[in-house]
Amino acid sequence: MAIFVTGDTHGSKKLGFFSVDGFMPRLNTESFPEQKSMSKDDFVVILGDFGGIWNNTETKEEAYALDWLDSKPFTTLFVPGNHENYDRLTGIDDADVLNNWMYSKLPDEEKKKLREGFPQKFWHGGMVREIRPSVLMLERGYIFNIDGCDCFAFGGARSHDISGGIFHPEKFKTSKQANAAYKQFEHHASFRINHLSWWQQEMPNHKEMQLGKGNLKKAHNMVDFIFSHDCPASDKTLLIGPNKPDELIVYFEEIKQNTIYKNWFFGHYHDNKRLSGGKDILLYEQIVQIN
């Protein structure tokens, strides 16, 4: 049995000719020949911005890509990043949102899926969302026993590509009103659209953060590996220089200072680097075996 780890995939396909994104080109047999000797008891962990769940409903293209991934000889695990459709992954808490014009034409079955998210189940010591039988999202704050290794998982990150702000189409009564207001946004340098290209659940809530601390305490603050999308505050400073830390990377820094671990793997910064004397590892397109 083996555990491999890789960085952001941003969906199933390449985003451009020179792109290293897309889980299909990255995890095909040509790019990842190790899979030829793997089984479903072997694992590939994607460190956030999986991007395989993006539209409001499952399209034929998305279904094909997820079925393709499920057909691979290994099990795919991912922590969520900041570019994920959390409405579909974990469900919409506010029922009134589903009465909005954005969702009014959806069949009742699709609305039910949006209310509940993907099926949740207990797996290897923690809670996961089952996207496909062998494609699982690791919920925040749990310690999973994977191939005999204790792995703390905590996805999420604050988006840094929203300098133009967040447009909220759900605040308008009709699509016509929303489209008229949208025209004021479309010339901004960089912005996202709530429920369509940005979701506030990209950042964890207090309950999830407390759950993570509690589970680490139960494990005497000792794990083998940590999987996240963003990184501890000190690592971010090493990567980009002085910055204003948000509550998540401060939380991670506290975990870093108080937890004994072998390696911390994260994505988000689109590079491949070793930090903190090699203990903390940023990954993008590289795929590395960790056990």
State each model region's role.
Residues W101-Q120, D147-P242:
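Active-site-proximal loop/helix segment associated with metal-binding centers of metalloenzymes
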Residues H10-S12, G51-G52, H83-N85, G156-H160, ...:
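Short, solvent-exposed loop/turn segments at secondary-structure junctions
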Residues M1-F4, V135, I143-A153, F225, ...:
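Beta-strand-turn-beta hairpins that frame and shape the catalytic cleft
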Residues T6, S12-I146, I240-G241, P245-E253, ...:
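Core catalytic region of metal-dependent phosphoesterases/phosphodiesterases
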Residues N243, V250-N258, F265, Y269-N291:
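Binuclear metal-dependent phosphoesterase catalytic core
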Residues M1, S39-D41, P73, G148, ...:
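A general structural motif
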Residues D8-T9, S31, K36-D41, G51, ...:
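A structural signal for the main folded, soluble domain(s) of proteins
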Residues V223-S228, I260-F266:
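Proline-aspartate-enriched helix->loop->beta-strand connector
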